[in-house]
Amino acid sequence: MMASLKAEETSQMQLVEREENDEDEDLFEMIDKLIAQGINAGDVKKLQEAGIHTCNGLMMHTKKNLTGIKGLSEAKVDKICEAAEKIVNFGYMTGSDALIKRKSVVKITTGCQALDDLLGGGIETSAITEAFGEFRSGKTQLAHTLCVTTQLPTNMKGGNGKVAYIDTEGTFRPDRIVPIAERFGMDPGAVLDNIIYARAYTYEHQYNLLLGLAAKMSEEPFRILIVDSIIALFRVDFTGRGELADRQQKLAQMLSRLIKIAEEFNVAVYMTNQVIADPGGGMFISDPKKPAGGHVLAHAATIRLLFRKGKGDTRVCKVYDAPNLAEAEASFQITQGGIADAKD
């Protein structure tokens, strides 16, 4: 009995020690650390020019992709990968270590307590949250609210970080940020200065904007990337069934990049999605709809949220799919100050 208690105490002490050590570790290791491992500075610069700024990000690329970088031979890539493996651990870890790692995940408030409760605290980092629904259901309004709440300190359920916003539909309104910032007692000018914004016009432009984010996120404390919407440009640039396979392949590459950004820099990715008619939705559902993007998008999103219009000016958010959340729903309201709890 005593031996069992001592073993349990020892185990708990080890967990505490590992947790304390883990807090001291950086979220990612900069790519220039490869130089200390014997990698030529010129080769490190080539990696940076290709959009790879951390050793963590390097390990998320295939050797085939790396040899596609001008000036990097197969032998050089092998040497670079071996050096990176000495700096970052991309192998197995125990379940306890995985639990400790999960503690670095930040939950960003949506501005609505009911919605936060539904999501287990808010929009989480190191994950992709997809919000889909018809127009005027509140997806973009939540995006604008998150632009502000992400910058709140962590003791106010914020992310204490900057915001990156990629707009594919031309719906971002900086003047909308002002009353939301005022609601949370923040300086609107400072809030806007902490948002980097880009308007994408083609799916290629959208992908290139993602590639350029790595350099910024490795230098500054970003906490969320918003893409509004993920599918719009693909539906415009690829038309007809003949281009569907190519579209889905390009979409998969885009989503893979988003997953890597989320995990590499511990940022939340919030992306909106459109809906399409669902002919197989059933005769008992009026006007059945499903999210656009097919299985490719469905498998990439960590958390999928269905937004719909409720009674009057209320909106409803339902957990459509999530690994750790119950299938439930919550009501919210769109106010001058952003997303808020619905009035009874």
Curated annotation (Swiss-Prot):
Q: Where in the cell is it found?
A: Nucleus
Keyword DNA-binding on entry? yes
SUPFAM superfamilies tied to this protein = P-loop containing nucleoside triphosphate hydrolases, Rad51 N-terminal domain-like
User: What Gene Ontology terms describe where this protein resides (cellular component)?
Assistant: nucleus
Chief site of localization: nucleus
Q: Which Gene3D superfamilies match?
A: 5' to 3' exonuclease, C-terminal subdomain, P-loop containing nucleotide triphosphate hydrolases
Q: Which domain of life is it from?
A: Eukaryota
Q: Spell out the subunit comment.
A: Double stacked ring-shaped homooctamer. Interacts with BRCA2A and BRCA2B.
Name used for this protein in its record:
Meiotic recombination protein DMC1 homolog
**What species does this protein belong to?**
Arabidopsis thaliana (Mouse-ear cress)
Provide the gene name from the record. Answer: DMC1
